[in-house]
């Protein structure tokens, strides 16, 4: 039975960059655990701020954090008060100087994590899983997606036997490395247990098509 490789991990170093941009030898484990603490803290603190990606860079005793969000106003706060409080709390958490950069997500309907979160929250609010997926697909295609695929797994409608059901529209070329495919998975806590939500969104090609540079042809 064929299994799918993680679409983002497969493209790292080709069209995707790392979310953690630092190098360490002896301090590797320490920095890795610190990254996990930072990500967990931000995800909890900004749970309602539509946060997608958190990028972490390190230089000497300084940590630069880029937060990609669809609601920058909620993260920044009035006069920058919220982001300043967040910076102070992260300074305390890490013991290092923290700089926070807020990046606005212009089209949240093309971000797999935010789409997945939206479907998961709807499932928790007892919206039918087929309806939640189809609405998300329609919004993504209207926003300019070339293709989208969704899948919900678990005890659908409270069935005794867990199963998976998914929908797709357009094309999602998982094997094409130059294809900009965003992928995310989320969990929905329902009265019947957890449901898993997976989302793949194809946003178009990034690298230009390869030119024919062959020499000495006919």
UniProtKB/Swiss-Prot annotation:
Residues 38-106 form the KH type-2 domain. GO terms for biological process: translation. GO terms for molecular function: mRNA binding; rRNA binding; structural constituent of ribosome. SMART domains: KH. GO terms for cellular component: cytosolic small ribosomal subunit. The keyword RNA-binding applies. Pfam families: KH_2, Ribosomal_S3_C. Keywords: Ribonucleoprotein, Ribosomal protein, RNA-binding, rRNA-binding. PROSITE patterns: KH_TYPE_2 (PS50823), RIBOSOMAL_S3 (PS00548). CDD domains: KH-II_30S_S3. HAMAP family: Ribosomal_uS3_B. Part of the 30S ribosomal subunit. Forms a tight complex with proteins S10 and S14. Belongs to the universal ribosomal protein uS3 family. Binds the lower part of the 30S subunit head. Binds mRNA in the 70S ribosome, positioning it for translation. This is Small ribosomal subunit protein uS3. It comes from Enterococcus faecalis (strain ATCC 700802 / V583). The gene is rpsC.
